[in-house]
Amino acid sequence: MTRKLEEDMKRPEEKLCAIVKKENVILNKDMSKEVSFKVGGMADAFVVPENLNELCNIIKLLREEDIEYFVMGNGSNFIITDKGYHGVIVKISPKYFGEIKMIKFDDECEIEVEAGILMSTLSRELVKESVAGFEFASGIPGTIGGAVFMNAGAYGGEMQDIVQSVKVIDERGDTKVISASEMEFSYRNSRLQRTKEIVISVKMLLKRGNREEIKRKIAQLTKKRNEKQPVNFPSAG
């Protein structure tokens, strides 16, 4: 970071530290340690909010200060150039945004999950509860927030098939709920890529199933994925 950029970041850094713990604000962050490709340059600043209030206040601050920022999940499917990122990276960490709420009906199951939960973690929890309909996503890398952002899918299923609504932070830093019909889902795309709204939680409708059948289907899909993809090497995820 140049001296000018250091000076430019000093005041926002102090304000960020007033919102989150000081140890959760890192200057000159090596982003190769945060992305699945394991390459890339430095970010001017890296901040990790621990709750929704902190996240909203961070976004409001960055917009008020007209500071470039990027919100990431677990670091899959994107990369920072070797020249670095001249702005603030905000990480929605699985550690702080990974809660699952589940309501079971006779044949269906409505779940609401926070954006930071890993797809693999959610898949395991749903298997434990004998909830079906998420098998296609069991091997998709990253977080549920990222999956909704890009309408992730595999083996005939997509996020748009199960999403009911999405809670986001809008351009003003306020929260609102977007219905599935308003999400403008298409192949590997959603309105979020245009609006820059930030996913904070997702409500999905799944169904009850047989645990052993669910596990068997996931095992079959995992085998296919391992046969076709370089799972032991750094990649998009």
In which residue ranges do the predicted regions lie?
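Hydrophobic, well-ordered secondary-structure segments
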Residues: M119, S123, A137, P141, ...
